[in-house]
Amino acid sequence: MSTMTPAEIVSELDKHIIGQNRAKKAVAVALRNRWRRQQVDEPLRQEITPKNILMIGPTGVGKTEIARRLAKLADAPFIKIEATKFTEVGYVGRDVDSIVRDLIEISVKQTRETEMRKMRTKAEDLAEDRILDILLPGARTVGFGSGTSEASGDESNTTRQTFRKRLREGALDDKEIELDIEMQAPAMDIMGPPGMEDMTEQIRSMFANLGGGKKTRRKVKVKEALKLLTDEEASKMLNDEEVKTKAVQNVEQNGIVFLDEIDKIASRSEAGGGEVSRQGVQRDLLPLVEGTTINTKYGMVKTDHILFIASGAFHLAKPSDLIPELQGRFPIRVELDSLSVKDFESILVATDASLVKQYQALLATEDVHLEFADDGIRRLAEIAFSVNEKTENIGARRLYTVIEKLLEEVSFSAGNHTGKSVLIDAAYVDRALNDVAQDEDLSRYVL
């Protein structure tokens, strides 16, 4: 669990997301409250439940990214789900309980990887021993008894240590060896009707277990063999029951569910009878968000302390169009701002993995040096903002389209620019994009 303070969390989020300070503060406090709750003694700790968050704002302003980065910081099981994927119980389609089942699968995978990392050093030693046994057959079985055999044993032990040193230095990486590796059962793609994902998953697991334990002899290079055997040894040391228990506990205490497009299941007051199943999905979500127990293949999972973050643009519906009971389950409401020209400029250059840095790195692989002038960045931001205003506002995602169109020619003919620098200034941007940006009909299709 993360022990970062709210200020530290916001500072980390600032490296990847521009603006939206109110939303960042809300999620930072929610994450910190999880740590605070763990410091509280029982039975009061059990009574403290997370305050779920409703983010309201247009598409492309950072709603999903805030939740995704938060989960990464917390190292917590995280799932992003579109609310529109679900149907009311009794209708054909997925029911909301599958959210928790998917989340527990993610948690099991995370927990398994964490536990395997802890055992990595010991597993690597065992893998090295197995490789040395193949490279030096009989070295371990030499001599107990006579003085000659003892001397021979010392000699073989010295040889073994020499080979181990060379193995660790990478001197044997390209040598080919034969070894027996546990076969992975081929993944079977079983098609099932909507809403029956659990049954198809169980059938898939059953077929996967049928092929388990079989070994196959393969000829591989030492470097690859070391990796394969390390993974195999680490898997052997894992206690599956312990992994399941930790995974369930991790979901119950630290799980984060991001419910996107929640406004699409809000029933507008003037709408007709077609809204029934939307209301049904909202009612099905109620116990999940409030706290219930879901039966999964890893055991019963309580949702009382899972943090739910819902988001929606609410263009056509309003938060008050959600059924009152569900509104009450999301006490913290945060409105995200639309992006300005200044925000677009910052997104292009100020974040840790900004678009400008990404394209510079991509073209640098072909020895093409992209240089962005300040006026070029400014003009790019202005065009992206302008196209958003004139057509559909898709937020920061517009920058992907604009910059891709801008660098289309350079990317295509990168081989002709090898060893050269390409300066992207305002004049270059205007030459590449002005015609498209000015023509509203054309920008609808191109940008």
UniProtKB/Swiss-Prot annotation:
SMART domains: AAA (SM00382), ClpB_D2-small (SM01086). Pfam families: AAA, AAA_2. The keyword Cytoplasm applies. GO terms for molecular function: ATP binding; ATP hydrolysis activity; peptidase activity; proteasome-activating activity. The keyword Ion transport does not apply. Transmembrane segments: none annotated. It is found in: Cytoplasm. InterPro entries: AAA+_ATPase (IPR003593), ATP-dep_Clp_protease_ClpX (IPR050052), ATPase_AAA_core (IPR003959), Clp_ATPase_C (IPR019489), HslU (IPR004491), P-loop_NTPase (IPR027417). GO terms for cellular component: HslUV protease complex. This is ATP-dependent protease ATPase subunit HslU. It comes from Paraburkholderia phymatum (strain DSM 17167 / CIP 108236 / LMG 21445 / STM815) (Burkholderia phymatum). The gene is hslU.
